[in-house]
Amino acid sequence: MSTSDDIHNTTATGKCPFHQGGHDQSAGAGTTTRDWWPNQLRVDLLNQHSNRSNPLGEDFDYRKEFSKLDYYGLKKDLKALLTESQPWWPADWGSYAGLFIRMAWHGAGTYRSIDGRGGAGRGQQRFAPLNSWPDNVSLDKARRLLWPIKQKYGQKISWADLFILAGNVALENSGFRTFGFGAGREDVWEPDLDVNWGDEKAWLTHRHPEALAKAPLGATEMGLIYVNPEGPDHSGEPLSAAAAIRATFGNMGMNDEETVALIAGGHTLGKTHGAGPTSNVGPDPEAAPIEEQGLGWASTYGSGVGADAITSGLEVVWTQTPTQWSNYFFENLFKYEWVQTRSPAGAIQFEAVDAPEIIPDPFDPSKKRKPTMLVTDLTLRFDPEFEKISRRFLNDPQAFNEAFARAWFKLTHRDMGPKSRYIGPEVPKEDLIWQDPLPQPIYNPTEQDIIDLKFAIADSGLSVSELVSVAWASASTFRGGDKRGGANGARLALMPQRDWDVNAAAVRALPVLEKIQKESGKASLADIIVLAGVVGVEKAASAAGLSIHVPFAPGRVDARQDQTDIEMFELLEPIADGFRNYRARLDVSTTESLLIDKAQQLTLTAPEMTALVGGMRVLGAYFDGSKNGVFTDRVGVLSNDFFVNLLDMRYEWKATDESKELFEGRDRETGEVKYTASRADLVFGSNSVLRAVAEVYASSDAHEKFVKDFVAAWVKVMNLDRFDLL
């Protein structure tokens, strides 16, 4: 323990006493606020991927850069790379095809249709946790092999696009005809923090398949892309794996046929690696020493590479031609009898006991081995439904090829949103239902048409609350993760959205707007719905004494019911929308956390979210006609009353019951109930970060700023799916 004499002594020598000792003095070190308060609201999720982390700057235009790309020159270089074996990571059979297919698959395979997060669209495989997942062992080598090509073409091709294109070229170079390729994935420069990968604290913790239906999780174990290839919890039982396979592939929006095609197609080329015990494998890239330069899993088994490589611990080669496309996967699956065995690393796998040695060794042409399969491969033979599909593909290789081509395209493009976001010369012409297709525009309203429509909407008898509510209901389905939802298409008027409980108040305005659309014939219903919001906001601002113009960009179209996959759109139904003070279930997270989740899906910042909630409350845009959060006696006036009254110390808040979901604000002197609120309201006074923003809008000089900020955030939400405006 230091004494005053110690301090005096160090001072006498000219040394600062506080620069002595071994404490970590680097930025971010020490106990953090998250350590003290682990349940702290994650407002920081709204600050992800800002321009401050982007080395290319906010003016960088990827689509413009991509247009300068020598696309077919790039594909030629990728094709050459496939057979340029490197001594630091030798290629199996002289080809990296299997490795690149796995890289693309595992990049795209993190997508979850339930919340739209994950997927290949941001190039997240470069960052933790995905760069160090147990299921991604050795993919660091695949990415490093691509570096010379990325270096050559620079910013004309993103890492995210390059990963998927490399997988496509690997398939094509192996004799397979792919369905096409759409570029347009833009890189980000830091890990996604908003993706819930699960609560487990240890890698490869087993999850029961039923648990996957209750959470947005896409794998049966923490750190896997899909399922444990040795069967659930290393059971070694092919039949028991069927439920897990259906759950994980189903969470990606894949049906049984697509699932069978993807498993078989992905295992037609390449191999797994389990030359020796996994105890020989070193730390993953995030934990590896600095001199490894971003690589991980260095192995001390033999040479550590080539014939001595260890990845999953499984040692499986499925087909006789592992670098050329074939139907051997199904032929071998049904032709031979399979017995359980173990890899050199001790992992459970199966071997064709009655097969000759027909499988080539990846590095010694003089050696052959028997066909081998994963436990989960045999599920395709022993599960009755999977077997029917597998036998059909066995007898009809062309049907298999077609199914895999389409399923692979879906897998690798599922999180890109509508086809209008695709760029490049190989974009397929066919519209696919999972792309949420839209018809071609048939209206081109003039400025005068828009003025006339605004007058018609204003004279329709709809209130400010109804006008704002219907526009919000239409636009707020957007998900930034997979770019689904939004106002374009007017799917609010279609099933299933028209029947959602959260939209009950909003859809009551639809018949009025549909009548205006039909009578005018000048604009789509989608445009008129958004224009209704414009009219509502402008009226509310005018009532507050401000003359504002809410920007409006026409050009939306109206989708048909047959262009709308009801089952997939059901996943967009919110379990909570704090902007409308709506919550359907109380067994999922906290109300305020779900508000952050919704705001993050809408790509909002904390100030944008705050302005929108405050504005929606005073405009009366709540889903059920309740008064929760309506801290004003001027409903329909775009004022900052929500913030002024929330932060007013004259009121004391108490929960109405033990759930602590609803609260009453009572006058401290009289005890009179003045307001009621939800957690989505009170969080703006409770959370220190959100309160700091709320205090800005509650200030006496903030009304005009608040209105301008509300309008800017409102227009942003209305245009989130207007990719044609980019």
Curated annotation (Swiss-Prot):
Pfam families xrefs: peroxidase (PF00141)
Enzyme class: oxidoreductase
Co-factor(s): heme b
Domain of life: Bacteria
Molecular function GO terms recorded: catalase activity; heme binding; metal ion binding
One cellular component (GO) term of this entry: cytosol
Residues that, per the record, bind heme b: H267
UniProt cross-link Tryptophyl-tyrosyl-methioninium (Tyr-Met) (with W-105), position: Y226-M252
CDD domains: catalase_peroxidase_2
Cross-link (Tryptophyl-tyrosyl-methioninium (Trp-Tyr) (with M-252)): W105-Y226
EC number: 1.11.1.21
Cofactor detail note: Binds 1 heme b (iron(II)-protoporphyrin IX) group per dimer.
UniProt-listed GO biological process terms: cellular response to hydrogen peroxide; hydrogen peroxide catabolic process
Transition state stabilizer (site feature) positions: R102
Reported modifications of this chain: Formation of the three residue Trp-Tyr-Met cross-link is important for the catalase, but not the peroxidase activity of the enzyme.
Alphabetical list of PANTHER family matching this protein: CATALASE-PEROXIDASE (PTHR30555:SF0), HYDROPEROXIDASE I, BIFUNCTIONAL CATALASE-PEROXIDASE (PTHR30555)
Assembly: Homodimer or homotetramer.
Family statement drawn from the similarity comment of this UniProt entry: Belongs to the peroxidase family. Peroxidase/catalase subfamily.
Function: Bifunctional enzyme with both catalase and broad-spectrum peroxidase activity.
Name this protein carries in UniProt: Catalase-peroxidase
Annotated organism of origin: Shigella flexneri
Chain's gene name: katG
